[in-house]
Amino acid sequence: YLAANLSRKQLLEALRYHYALLRGCMSAEEFSLYLNTPGLQLAKLEGKNGEQFTLELTMMISMDKEGDSTILFRNSEGIPLAELTFTLCEYQGKRTMFIGGLQGAKWEIPHQEIQNATKACHGLFPKRLVMEAACLFAQRLQVEQIIAVSNETHIYRSLRYRDKEGKIHA
C-alpha cells in the first residue's frame, strides 16, 4: 500500500490521518458522497465549444494500493480520461498530499478522446487538469507539501509484487 519504503506503522497512521482530515474538512453530505459511488463532484467544466467535463473525488478499489482517494477527470459520457490517486498524511512533520499514481485513460479508450478533451480544454491535457485539481484541493485542506512516489518506491516494486513478475497464474 502507498509506497514500498514505508513501515506498517507509517501506513496505518497515514490511513487514519487521511480519513480524519477529510471527515473534518467536509460536510456530512460531502463525506457520504465521497465514500459512495460515483463520488463527490469537485467541479463541472465547460470546454470551449460547450463540451462538458467533470472532476470528481472518489475511492477506487482498482487504485487502492496507490492511495485512498482518486481525482477523476471524466468526459460527458462519464469516461475517465485521467486519474490521480493520493493519500493525505503527516510526512516529515508536515501535512502532506502523497501521490501514489497518475494515469491517463485506459488502453481501450481511443486516443482521439484525449485529443478532443485537450482541444476542448484550451490545450490542457487531462493529466494536467487532475494535477491542477489536486493542487487546488490540497490548498483547500492547507496541505504544506505535495510529494509523489518514485519509480523505485512505487508499491508494485515491493517484494510482494516483484516475486510475481513473469509468472502466469491460472
Residue positions per predicted region:
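Acyl-donor binding region in acyl/amide transferases
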Residues: 83, 91-170
